[in-house]
Each structure stands twice: as C-alpha cells, then as structure tokens.
C-alpha cells in the first residue's frame, strides 16, 4: 500500500507541475490579482476534486462518460461558464487592481468560482477514471475506501504544488503592481486563459 501511495504522490506531483489549464489559471490569477486570490481559487479547484472522487468511487463517472449527450452537455456548460468569466474580466476596469482604492477581493466568491470550474470540466472526470484505478493496491476489495484515500492524497499534493505556484506568482504580482501599464496586459492575459480553457474542455 505504502509503495503504491508513494508512486501515486510522485505521479500527482509531476502532473500538477506539467503545463495545464488549472495551474496556468492559478498562475494567471496570482499575477493579476495576488497570491490570496490565487490561493482562494486553488482551494476551490481542489475542493471540487472530492466530488469527482465520489462520482468515481460509486461508478457514477463511468455512467456519465458513457452517455454522450450528458457528457457533451457538461462540456458546453463548462465552456459557457468560462466564456462568461472572460466577458466579466473584459467588462472590468483594467486599472482597478492597481489602485489604492481597489475593492477587496471576495475570497468566498473566488473559492466558489474554482469549485464550479472544476465541476464543469468533464475532462477532470476522465482524468480520474484513467489515473486512479491504476493505483488501487487491492483492486478486488473495498475500492471505495481506496478511491477516497487516493482522492484526498491527490487533493493535498495538488494544493501544495498549486499553492507554491500561487505564492511565486503573487510575489511577482507585487512587482507588477508598481507598473500601471501592466494592467491592460494582465486583463487580456486572463481573458485569453479563460477562452483557452473553454476550448480545451470542448475539444474531444
């Protein structure tokens, strides 16, 4: 069991560090809005994984992924939500983040945003279906408990990796905040990241 879990931790670390929509999103948010906003987003993204773990453990993920209409519907909802977020950033004032009078971030709202993004990304479901069964140490007995152990391990490791990304990006954000001209660049960077993730979800 221990050897299998250690292998799973290594695999999770490598996957979390590999360029992908989630860590790119966390990095973008940390650069644009600071480490606290990025950590709130990270907490939301990771918390959504417990739902995917539950769906996997009880066989619901397999049912969803084998239903083309339902699976496609989730993909469309996820893409539309991301495009809505891109539009919200587009409508925002690019200079707000650099003003001393800028409104405080609603971290609860950012957390919820991360959760919704995770839940409406069916590729996370496919990822769990492909990865987790490979690391069951007793495939014939009590797989529900094993899936939850793997799920919690995945969440902890991913949060640590994404948290480091958020902190590193946040330290750069402090420097960027001194230059008002970066506001427009970061605004459009966020928009492009949202659109790119939406496209990633829709592509088969």
State each model region's role.
Residues 2-72, 130-150, 154-155:
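Juxtamembrane transmembrane-helix termini in multi-pass membrane transport proteins
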Residues 13, 17, 50-51, 87, ...:
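Hydrophobic/aromatic residues within the transmembrane alpha-helices of Major Facilitator Superfamily
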Residues 30-37, 105, 177-181:
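Juxtamembrane helix-boundary/capping and inter-helix hinge elements in multi-pass membrane proteins
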Residues 36-109, 168:
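Membrane helix-loop-helix hairpins that form the core translocation module of multi-pass transporters
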Residues 53-57, 119-125, 193-204:
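Hydrophobic alpha-helical transmembrane segments in multi-pass integral membrane proteins
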Residues 66-94, 161-165, 173-204:
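Selective transmembrane alpha-helices of multi-pass membrane proteins
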């Amino acid at each position: 069991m221990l050897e299998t879990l250690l292998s799973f931790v290594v695999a999770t670390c490598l996957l979390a560090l590999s360029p992908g929509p989630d860590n790119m999103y966390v990095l973008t948010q940390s650069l644009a809005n600071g480490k606290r906003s990025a950590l709130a987003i990270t907490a939301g993204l990771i918390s959504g994984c417990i739902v995917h773990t539950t769906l996997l453990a009880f066989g619901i993920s397999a049912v969803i992924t084998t239903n083309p209409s339902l699976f496609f519907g989730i993909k469309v909802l996820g893409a539309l939500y991301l495009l809505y977020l891109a539009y919200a950033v587009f409508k925002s004032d690019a200079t707000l983040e650099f003003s001393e009078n800028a409104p405080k971030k609603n971290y609860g709202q950012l957390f919820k945003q991360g959760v919704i993004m995770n839940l409406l990304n069916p590729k996370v479901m496919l990822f769990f279906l492909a990865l987790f069964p490979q690391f069951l140490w007793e495939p014939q007995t009590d797989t529900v408990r094993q899936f939850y152990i793997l799920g919690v391990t995945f969440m902890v490791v991913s949060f640590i990796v994404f948290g480091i990304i958020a902190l590193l990006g946040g330290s750069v954000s402090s420097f960027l905040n001194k230059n008002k001209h970066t506001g427009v660049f970061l605004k459009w960077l966020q928009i492009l990241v949202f659109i790119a993730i939406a496209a990633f979800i829709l592509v088969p």
